[in-house]
Amino acid sequence: MTPSLVFLIVVIVVVEGQGWRPWDRFNHPGNFGNWGGNNWGTRQRNQEPHDIPPPVPPPGFRGNNDRFGGNIIKVVEIIDLGKSKNRGDILSDFKDVHKKHRHLGRKEWKGKVKQFCHRFPGHPNCRRGKVPDQKELEEMIGQFSKGGIGRFLKRVPKIYIEDPLARVDPKLKGFLENAGRGFGHVSSEHVNKLRDICKRRKCREQPESAKKTRELFTQKLADFETKIAGKDKTDSVQLRFDRTLQIKEALLEKGNLTADIVPVDNGVYDLDTMLTEEQANILLNELNKAGVGDDEIPLPDADTDDEDDDDSTNSASGAAPGSSRLKKSALYFEGNLIKKWDPSSPIRYVLDSSLEDLDKNDVRAAIYEIEKNTCIRFKELSSPPTGSHIVYYKVDSPTFCGLSYVGRADPANPVYLSFGCDNNKGVAIHETMHALGVAHQHLRNDRDQFITINWSNIDPQQYDAFVVVDSKLYTSYGVKYAYDSIMHYNGYTAAQNIAIPTMNPKTNSAVNLKVLGQRQKMGTTDIELLKKMYCQPGCDDKNVYCGAWALKDLCKNPGHDQYMAANCKKSCGLCAIGK
């Protein structure tokens, strides 16, 4: 057996918490995802009925078919990323040059240094107004071992985030238990449990799989955006992934865990989502990182007609490229962090040629389910249009189920699916709902009322998978927490010991633990949320906390009903009923 195939078999158990259910090996033999138990390697289509069938069967619908066997070689090829194109990772290039004791010619060295200092303008060796000498290479690389990538990156723009409670009755504030904690709050008890874990395992070593994942999706995203923009977008993608790492580091810093844990640097946030630069900048502002980093100092004798005009230099604050001053702009809680699609026209989407017929059927079935239950409409196109749209890609990899942005992204939304997980239609629904702007259920601000996080069993390097969303930036719209939400992860997500849950339901735990992470169909609350987001035009909440107040039954509370009726129509269910 080849080393690559051995790795393939071993890595199956670490897929993130969507459709893979590793605990089935202990509780339900024979149903380990689609690849385990008695049917390993066999795709049983008749075990995946469409629970809410579309009015007309999706084009290309077929019955049983084995997809795994035909893709095994592709999977191994994806794993062996050492042979793939290392697109734009100048830091890896420098490490390779140093490791092999290569001496670069003057022109080649200048070109690489320019690329390095464009990506890391805050690096000390890029702040001297001259081209660093190649003899400084070891020093340049060594700076990164000290941690804190944010100090090397372009300055985080200052963004004014309005306090939604500034002009609210103090009595209403009393109903918000966690409002004052801020994004990234973690108790000292939980911090100590994470530290205890790191006494027994290595928490400061970057997993090799993380590097490969980042390389893979840097290439995928850069290819996707370059094709649309007509110019190389690698720098823009690298900055977004660097910002994602910066957020993970800032979250650990807030918990005083920097000395104990190095977060996974794979470009992915919360296991299956990507951040736009705008979203990353907003979250960094919430973590008090506004102004961290520096502005680029042009190197002498360097070309000036480069790609600095790409969107990697544009910030959520509206700062002009190259601006050395921090500018401000207001953040409206329902508008900026998550961009929604225009509900008055169909969302255009394309099924990339990388999808097989059965893969396309799964995506179409997912879209049919959303259409059947809501007012949202989609339109399939044969080729990418101009303007906003979704493109579904297949990435043959056993290490993930799906990956997407949360909300509409510019220039378009790529959705990456492996089609190797339990119930691929459900995974496609999950990722499409991310694209529509829906965050994970288990990261809601009220999640601790419904589930208990087992901090003694989570992977500390994937700490971001358990950080609740910022209460000032997300709203529930008054939709209740649901264990059967298709946006919930399974109870064993990011577990060290996959036989022990990382999330336990507080209600009817034995039954609901099996429900967590279901991908059979949209839950009733998923449908309700999408309807409130897209099917009630002209009716909005005026405060991001309306959802939380509605869940406290304040819509009919005699002391607050007038305020709620005037300011929280959507969360109180006072809008015209959409489909």
Curated annotation (Swiss-Prot):
Keyword Ligase: no
Database matches in PROSITE patterns: ASTACIN, SHKT
Cofactor(s) essential for the protein: Zn(2+)
Residue span(s) of the pro-peptide: 18-328
Residues the record lists as binding Zn(2+): 430, 434, 440
GO molecular function: metalloendopeptidase activity; zinc ion binding
GO BP, sorted A to Z: proteolysis
Manner of cofactor binding, per the entry note: Binds 1 zinc ion per subunit.
Organs and tissues of expression: Expressed in the anterior part of the intestine, CEP neurons and to a lesser extent in hypodermis.
Chain residue ranges for the region called Disordered: 35-58, 293-323
Bridged cysteine pairs (disulfide): 375-535, 401-421, 539-575, 546-568, 555-572
Compositionally skewed regions (Acidic residues) per UniProt: 293-312
Secretion signal, residue range per the UniProt entry: 1-17
Compartment(s) where it occurs, according to its Swiss-Prot or TrEMBL record: Secreted
Keywords of this entry: Cleavage on pair of basic residues, Disulfide bond, Glycoprotein, Hydrolase, Metal-binding, Metalloprotease, Protease, Secreted, Signal, Zinc, Zymogen
Phenotypic effect of disruption: Defects lead to retarded growth.
Enzyme nomenclature, EC number: 3.4.24.-
Primary location group: secreted
Keyword Glycoprotein: yes
Protein's name according to its UniProt entry: Zinc metalloproteinase nas-11
Lineage, highest ranks first: Eukaryota, Metazoa, Ecdysozoa, Nematoda, Chromadorea
Gene transcribed to yield this protein: nas-11
